[in-house]
Amino acid sequence: SRAVLAVADSLDLWNRSFSPNAQIRLAVPEPRVDGFDFNDKAALLSAIGENYALIVNDELVAGSALLSERVRVAVDGDSSRMRTFDYDVDARGFWQIHRAAPEHLVNYVLGLVRSALGGRTKNTVLWDLYSGSGLFTIPLATLANVGGDSSSAVGALGTTGTFGSAEPARVLSIEGAPIAVKNARRNIGRAGLSRDIVEALEGDVAQTLESQVFKASKSSKIVRRFAHPDVVVLDPPRAGAKAQVCKQIAKSGARAVVYVACDPTSLARDVGTFRELGYSVQSLRAFDLYPETHHVESVVLMSKAD
C-alpha cells in the first residue's frame, strides 16, 4: 500500500543493511479517513504518525509495539448508519492483512448472526471462538441484537450510552494467544463492556470449553451466563477447529454456527463433521482477501433443526 511505501521511504528502509536471512516486517495501518488523499505523501506520513511498526527478527526496531486499527460497522445492517470501533493490536500479533478485510468480514458475519437470531433479543448468548484481539467480539456484543436501540450502544469512538430496551448480547470469547487476549480485554474495556456482558478467556479452545463450561460447577459465572449459546462464531487458524471443538459446539445446543475459514480443506473437513452432528449448510461465501494468490477466505452459515 501507499502507506507502507511512504513509511519505508521515511525510514530509508531500502538502503539499510540487514544480516543475511533476516525476517523484516513492516506493519502500517492505513488512515481510516473518508476522502483522504493517499497521493499526498506528507499528509499521509502525518496521519500515520507513530502508528507503524518495523520488526526485524521479531524485535521492534522503529515505531510502536501497539498499533491502532479502526473498523466501521453498519448499525442493524443499515449502511447509512455506521458505527466505529477502535482496536489496539500487537504489532507482532495477527490482524487481517487486506485493509478492507476486517470491515467486510465483521459486517457480513454480523448479518449472518442477526439472521440466525431472527426476532429473538432477550437473553441472547453468543460464543466467539479463536477470537484474537476481539475483532468480532465487541461488535457482536453491541450490535447483534435486532431489537432495542442499538445505535446508542456502548463502544463508538470510546463513548458510552445505553442499550435501549434490549439487553446486549452476552458474548464468551476464547483465544489461545496470551498477547491477543490481553489486547482483547483492553479493547473490550475501552468499549465500556463489563465482564457480565463479555468474558474473554485465554487458553486452548477445546480445553477451555471443557474445563470452564462442560465440567465446571453449575453455579459458576461462566456456566450461568454463557454456557448455552444461540449462535457460535469461530475463526480458527489454518488447521481448522477439528472434530473435538465441532462436537463441543454441537453439545452446547447452539442452533447456528458461523464459521470463518482461511483454508478450504480444513473447512470442508469441519463442515463434514458438523453435518454428521445434525447441522446443515445454509450459505457459503468466499472473500478474495489475498489478491494474486490461491488463498481465499470463506464464511459458512450452518444451522441445526429444532
Question: PLM ranges: what are they?
Answer:
Residues 1-153, 158-234, 241-242, 247, ...:
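Accessory RNA-recognition modules of RNA-modification enzymes
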Residues 247-251, 255-301:
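C-terminal substrate-binding/active-site "lid" region of AdoMet-derived donor-dependent transferases
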Residues 237-239, 264:
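Short glycine-rich anion-binding loops that position phosphate/pyrophosphate groups of nucleotides
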Residues 305-306:
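Flexible, glycine-/basic-rich loop-and-beta segments that form/coincide
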